[in-house]
UniProtKB/Swiss-Prot annotation:
GO terms for biological process: cell division; negative regulation of exit from mitosis; nucleolus organization; positive regulation of protein localization to nucleolus; protein localization to nucleolus; rDNA heterochromatin formation. Has a role in chromosome maintenance and is involved in mitotic exit. Inhibits the action of CDC14 by sequestering it in the nucleolus. Also binds to RNA polymerase I and stimulates rRNA synthesis. Influences RDNA chromatin by tethering SIR2 to rDNA in the nucleolus. One of its GO terms (molecular function) is protein phosphatase inhibitor activity. Residues 166-180, 391-407, 682-691, 822-833, 969-999, 1055-1070, 1123-1137, 1158-1169 have a biased composition (Low complexity). Residues 590-601, 710-725 have a biased composition (Acidic residues). PANTHER family: NUCLEOLAR PROTEIN NET1-RELATED. The gene is NET1. The modification Phosphoserine is found at residues 60, 166, 231, 252, 437, 439, 447, 452, 497, 830, 1056, 1059. It comes from Saccharomyces cerevisiae (strain ATCC 204508 / S288c) (Baker's yeast). Phosphorylated by CDC5. This is Nucleolar protein NET1. Residues 160-260, 345-1189 are annotated as: Disordered. InterPro entries: Dnt1-like_N (IPR018844), Net1/Tof2 (IPR043185).
Length: 1189
């Protein structure tokens, strides 16, 4: 079959050629509509395409409206074998059918092709219209077509539908038989039943259309019978033009009517669908559109806006036609909810065209409104109703409820344990307070917060606090106080962040050495506590495995957080640490635990321990140190008031835990930290600790002993810890997993810790403990002045009160000269360690010591002159601290002189041997010293240290005088023979063995840094001593400065550690022997430092006086007053302290420092060089004081 475009050309249009092309647009339309069919029908596709292109081009040129009234155009399907004569007959018949309004039958003069050629009637259609399907029919008569008249009976049917059965020629429409499917503009005339089918359709459609103008859109079903989509489009356009705009929107009354129609249709399908159809108003516009569009999806969308819940289901029901409607209503409703509507609509689309037509034709407009209401009820109740969907949502809500219940259940388990731990009285408080606090604490668990309003949920809330505990469990050690371990778990996250920071800093800057020394400083109190705190120690020992690695960072961080606690708490904490460390903890990790436990443990440590009584004396001691004696009852009371008032305010758990948790019941807060976010858990643990402290002053006293480091805070000792703990919490909230809980109170320890291997630190701490205990036993005053001066001085500048600061400074001044004096006599043996070899170490040390003494004698005048100059600069930089230190040093000179006298004999013996070697170096060193003195005034103290080696008491008898008898005897042992240098190097070798690797690295870095600093000094003799010494004071400074970030701490590291080192250097082994082994580990670093420091000091004193002068000028250029002062005044100190510290670094480094004991470890040297500049002010003041002395 060929599809031909028949164009009726009346005589008026025959003369004009453009009409051809004017037909072009219609042709183009038809060809465009069915280009494929045209090409397939015609053999010459190329030509047809070309013509089509021309036509399409012409289409734009010739307006279709110009030809509309003049000619008619329609499609005609004919057999390719028909002749043109037969074609003409078919055209006449088609015209009669298509245009019944024609007044006269058309008479065909000729048939032409698109190019206007007349065609022979004998031609076959396939021959002529293979390329072009346009047939121009030249008419004899004008075509009188009424524009209002419908083009075809199907057009009249439309009118009847639209006009409720009364055809009105309102809209011109181009209609071609559905068979042709070509759009034609036809003059509309009142529909006359030209065809029975037309009348029939109009009747049926009219009956249905009467229901609503929206229904006219249903006409597509009849048009759907017609194959052509264009007719449908025209119908839509026409309907929309005239009637559609109002009818589509009017939904209420027409919807009712149409709903009746639709309902009737659906009723046909099934009565059950009435539920789906229930709202015909919704259905009707959708149905009309759906029937037009034949697409279920748009229908669904239209349905939904009218009735959101019902429409989807209804639409589905409509789509799910008749038989399926019953189950499809429910299934479709569920499918809508499930998004299965697409599938339903697809089925509906497939079914729809046929089904909708029967529906329309059926014209079932019979759905009583009561049925609709019933359907609505059914929709509410039925499976298709939204209620069917709601159950799933309801299921979700129950899901949440069981989830809350589940959380409550596991919480209830925790709460049962917590309740068992908590007294019933505290439980109601904990419930109320936990409800308040758990808004934050229960962050991790929404259910606990929900439970919190419930009275029973409160134990659950406590369990919520447990949630963070799981993350913190690494620190939890089953100990006598489980809650204490749990609290530590809470605290370790706080500390973990601080520890991480401190560890990073300590790693970057070796700063952990002094803190363990601090820990060991107060061995006597710790020993007393050790007896009393045996239970606590046991618990702490259990906890220790997790804590030890955190010791250094904890100390450093705690020093930062609590400055005041550091000095006094450093002393007390060293005692506590000694007891706890002796108990099993290294470097006061237990003290950190104790300190943290002071707050947390007071709460957590429910088991009343004998240490409580000891904690009172310790707290009294701390308060006496702090001058806060009145605060001690407040401290116990203050644990409740402070922790509840200060830390509790910041910590939601504090108030709740204090109220809720009895000391007997630490578990609830332990539970709280487990489940609460770590910050909340930390707060809860801290607050609980505060609450238990409040509840149990004895425990607070116990913890106060462990927290003795916080006694400087005595009122706020724990409180400061809490404040620091709050900071720790805030800091550690991000890092809850770093186990140790010691961080909060360990701020006291933090300043001194240099970055060293834990082994080194432990050794130092052990040795320091041994040395310090011996020294304390021999002279508690001198020991406290030495170690306390270290710790308290370090803490003093930043934290401890002026009284403590002055005491610490006085102690420092005394201990520094004592250290220097003691270290100088011993220095003979070990100074060459820094230089190169252990074998030549003692010889060079003796030689250098002799030279140094000679040089010191000759250089003393220059040094004294430069000292005055450097003192002037020092006075500028540190007049305040320096004057106090000078006064205190002078005050301490007399006691130091007694010890110095003892040392003098030893030093004289050593100095005699060393003077020979020194005399050789004196000339060289004098030259170097002169250059160095010229370079920097700061280094006078180093010559004064050499003078100490010479005179051993000339200027710095103060430092010698203060040496405690234990240290003096140790110094005697060390200074008795240069062999002690080797023996000290041997004892240090023991310590060095662990830290030999670090020592070699430290030595190299120290020598490098010394080289950097020292420009003019010859490196061989000077390098061994001065390089080490100059870096070592700076190392001490850096190490101290890093943890405390306090110049005083650095000075303490330089001054007090050197004094301890020099004092203990003479006999580190003897001190270690004197001291219990427990004390030795903490003092091991000190003993190592001392053992190396004294021999190193002698060599270094002469060389370091020169080199440190050279170094000091270079470094003092950066820190002219502070660094030069710290270099010069600490040259004497650093001769001992830096030498001892370089030795301590080498001791820490161990075996390698046996090879070169005088060398400062690279870490200590780098830290010293790096830290010199940081604390320049504080160090300068202390150094100036020494210089002034």
């Amino acid at each position: 079959m060929y599809k031909l475009q028949v164009v009726l050309v009346p005589p008026s249009l025959q003369a004009t050629m453009p009409i051809q092309f004017g037909y072009g647009p219609t042709i183009a339309e038809s060809s465009q509509l069915l280009p494929n069919r045209t090409n397939m029908a015609q053999s010459a596709g190329d030509a047809s395409l070309q013509y089509a292109n021309l036509r399409s081009a012409n289409v734009s040129f010739t307006p279709s409206y110009f030809n509309q009234s003049r000619f008619r155009k329609f499609l005609l399907f004919t057999k390719p074998t028909n002749t043109l004569l037969n074609l003409s007959d078919e055209i006449i018949d088609k015209c009669e059918k298509m245009y019944p309004s024609l007044q006269e039958d058309i008479e065909i003069l000729s048939l032409q092709d698109n190019s206007g050629c007349d065609l022979d009637p004998d031609f076959l259609v396939k021959d002529v219209f293979n390329v072009n399907n346009i047939v121009r029919v030249i008419l004899k008569n004008e075509i009188d077509l009424d524009d209002s008249a419908p083009v075809s009976l199907y057009k009249s049917v439309k009118r009847s539908k639209l006009n409720n059965g009364s055809p009105q020629s309102v809209q011109p429409q181009q209609q071609i038989p559905s068979s042709s499917g070509v759009l034609r503009i036809a003059k509309k005339r009142p529909p006359t039943g030209t065809t029975t089918t037309t009348t029939i359709r109009s009747a049926t459609n009219g009956s249905m259309r009467v229901s609503t103008p929206l229904a006219r859109q249903i006409y597509p079903p009849p048009s759907s019978k017609i194959v052509s989509n264009n007719s449908d489009d025209e119908d839509e356009d026409i309907g929309e033009r005239s009637f559609l705009p109002p009818p589509t929107q009017p939904q209420s009354p027409p919807i009712r009517i149409s709903s009746g129609i639709d309902a009737g249709k659906k009723i046909k399908s099934s009565i059950v669908e009435e539920d789906i159809v229930s709202r015909s108003a919704t259905v009707d516009p959708d149905k009309t559109k759906q029937q037009r569009l034949l697409s279920g999806t748009p229908i669904m969308s239209t349905m939904t806006p009218n009735r959101v819940t019902l429409t989807g289901q209804r639409v589905v029901s409509e789509h799910a036609h008749k038989n399926e409607l019953v189950f499809s209503a429910s299934a479709s409703s569920s499918s809508f909810a499930n998004g299965g509507t697409a599938a339903v609509t697809a089925q509906d689309i497939n079914r729809k065209p046929p089904v909708t037509t029967p529906r329309i034709t059926s014209g079932m407009l019979k759905i009583p409104e009561p049925r609709i209401s019933e359907i609505e009820k059914e929709l509410k109740e039925g499976p298709s109703s939204p209620a069917s969907i709601l159950p799933a949502k309801a299921a979700k809500i129950p899901m949440k409820k069981p989830y809350l219940e589940n959380g409550e259940n596991y919480e209830s388990d925790d709460s049962s344990s917590s309740e068992n731990q908590e007294t019933p009285e505290t439980e109601p408080h904990s419930k109320a307070s936990l409800q308040r606090s758990q808004s934050s604490i229960a962050d991790n668990n929404g259910s606990p917060v929900k439970n919190s309003p419930l009275g029973d949920a409160m134990p659950h809330n406590v369990h919520l606090a447990e949630l963070p505990k799981a993350s913190n469990t690494s620190i939890t050690k089953s100990s006598n106080g489980e809650s204490w371990g749990k609290q530590q778990e809470h605290q370790p996250p706080r500390k973990s962040s601080l520890e991480t920071i401190v560890e990073k800093k300590s790693q970057a800057e070796p700063s952990g050495i002094v803190e363990p020394k601090r820990m060991t400083n107060f061995l006597d109190d710790n020993q007393v506590r050790e007896k009393e705190d045996t239970n606590d120690k046991l618990l702490e020992k259990e906890i220790l495995p997790t804590i030890p690695h955190n010791d250094q960072p904890i100390l450093a961080s705690s020093d930062k957080s609590n400055g005041t606690l550091k000095s006094l708490a450093g002393k007390v904490s060293s005692n506590n640490n000694a007891s706890k460390e002796d108990g099993t903890i290294i470097n006061g990790t237990i003290e950190d635990d104790g300190n943290d436990n002071d707050e947390v443990d007071t709460t957590v440590r429910i088991v009343p321990q004998d240490s409580d009584s000891s904690s009172f004396p310790k707290s009294d001691l701390f308060k006496m140190i702090e001058g806060d004696d009145t605060d001690l009852p407040q401290w116990f009371k203050g644990k409740n008031s402070r922790t509840s008032g200060n830390s509790k305010n910041s910590k939601p758990y504090t108030t709740v835990l204090n109220k809720d948790i009895d000391n007997s019941k630490p578990d609830p807060r332990n539970i709280l930290p487990q489940r609460t976010p770590r910050s909340a858990a930390k707060r809860a643990a801290q607050l609980l600790a505060g609450a238990k402290k409040n509840e149990v002053p004895q425990k607070s006293t116990e913890d106060s002993s462990s927290a003795a480091s916080t006694d400087d805070e005595s009122e706020s000792g724990i409180e400061t810890d809490f404040s620091s703990d709050d900071d720790f919490k805030r800091k550690n909230m991000s890092v809850p997993n770093n186990g140790p809980k010691d961080i909060s109170l360990h701020s006291l320890k933090g300043s001194v810790v240099p970055v060293k291997d834990s082994k080194i630190i432990n050794k130092e701490v052990d040795e320091e403990r041994n040395d310090k205990r011996d020294s304390q036993k021999k002279s508690a005053v001198s020991e406290s002045s030495v170690t306390n001066s270290k710790i308290s001085e370090q803490m003093a500048k930043s934290f401890y009160p002026n009284s403590n600061k002055k005491q610490n400074e006085a102690t420092k001044v005394e201990t520094k000269p004592a250290t220097q004096a003691s270290s100088f006599p011993v220095v003979g043996g070990s100074p060459s360690v820094a230089t190169k070899g252990t074998t030549s170490f003692n010889e060079e040390g003796n030689r250098k010591n002799v030279k140094t003494k000679a040089k010191n004698e000759s250089a003393q005048i220059d040094r004294q002159q430069k000292e005055t100059t450097s003192r002037v600069a020092d006075l500028k930089s540190a007049n305040i601290g320096g004057e106090d230190l000078n006064k205190k040093a002078e005050g301490s000179k007399e006691p130091e002189k007694a010890s110095a006298n003892i040392q003098d004999a030893n030093d004289k013996n050593n100095s005699k041997e060393k003077e020979d070697s020194k005399s050789k170096q004196v000339s060289q060193k004098k030259l170097k010293m002169t250059d160095h003195l010229k370079e920097g005034n700061v280094q006078l103290p180093k010559p004064s240290a050499n003078d100490k080696l010479k005179d051993l008491k000339a200027k710095f008898t103060n430092s010698k005088t203060l040496v405690p008898p234990g240290i003096i005897s140790n110094e005697k042992n060390n200074s008795s023979a240069n062999d002690d240098d080797s023996s000290s190097s041997g004892s240090s070798t023991e310590d060095e063995s662990s830290s030999s690797s670090s020592s070699s690295d430290e030595e190299t870095s120290t020598s490098r840094k010394a080289r950097r600093v020292v420009v003019n000094t010859p490196r061989e003799p000077v390098r061994s001593s001065s390089k080490i010494e100059a870096p070592s004071p700076s190392v001490n400074k850096k190490i101290n400065a890093t943890p405390d970030k306090i110049p005083v701490t650095q000075l303490m590291d330089m001054s007090s550690p050197p004094s301890v080192k020099s004092k203990t250097t003479s006999n580190p082994s003897s001190i270690l022997h004197d001291l219990p082994r427990k004390v030795r580990p903490s003092l091991s670093s000190l003993s190592d430092l001392v053992s190396r420091g004294i021999p190193d000091v002698k060599e270094k004193t002469s060389k370091s006086n020169e080199k440190s002068q050279t170094k000091a000028p270079s470094s003092s250029d950066d820190e002219s007053s502070s660094d030069s002062d710290s270099n010069s005044s600490s040259d004497s100190v650093s001769d001992s302290s830096s030498d001892s510290k370089s030795e301590s670094d080498s001791d820490d480094s161990g075996d390698s420092s046996d090879d070169g004991k005088s060398f400062i470890s690279a870490k200590s040297a780098s830290a010293a060089l790096g830290k010199k500049k940081k604390p320049s002010g504080g160090f300068a003041s202390l150094i100036k004081d020494f210089k002034k002395k």
